[in-house]
Amino acid sequence: MTKLPKDAAEVLLFNTLTGLRPTEAVLSIQLIKREPEKYINKETGMLEHFRYPDLFIRKTKKAYITAFNEVILDVADKADTSSWMAIRSQLKRRGIESHLKYCRAIFATYLRKQGIESEVINIYQGRVPTSVFAAHYLKTNIQDDRNRILKAVGNFYE
């Protein structure tokens, strides 16, 4: 990460801490900066992607929610808000290969190794139908899942 421009490195870190897809991560950073009052739910500690279905709820790829804390918001604040393709081009010019899909895989694998259930990881990574997400978000203790995920992810940056 030391070879990267600081703002591009922050995008990679944000991507790893949230488990979002590359384009979703950049969109999320943009929304955190542009529309925090609508996008950031401080009461639940969630970034609420589902409020932007045209951006995050697509036919085959979905992102509903992301747990956040102040560290994650600080990373987003320092991150580049260009498109993913612009960031990728910037890295390519420096001779740095960019495989952001690995950030998402690191997130999921690490959470699983920390004892987070696959079902919870699948919800956070948008690998469930909208109806399953709605049932989980409304009926389970989302705060408990959020706290466990943030505790596990906290080891990335401590």
Feature locations, PLM:
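Basic, Lys/Arg- and aromatic-enriched nucleic-acid-binding interface segment
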Residues: 1-22, 104
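Generic structural marker for isolated residues within well-ordered, non-membrane alpha-helices
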Residues: 11, 87-88, 118
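Alpha-helix N-cap/helix-start motif at helix boundaries, enriched for small hydrophobics
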Residues: 11-12, 23-28, 121
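Active-site-proximal segment of tyrosine recombinases
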Residues: 25, 98, 108, 115-127
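Active-site/catalytic core of tyrosine-dependent DNA strand-transfer enzymes
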Residues: 60-112
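Catalytic-site neighborhood detector that most strongly recognizes the C-terminal catalytic loop/helix
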Residues: 125-158
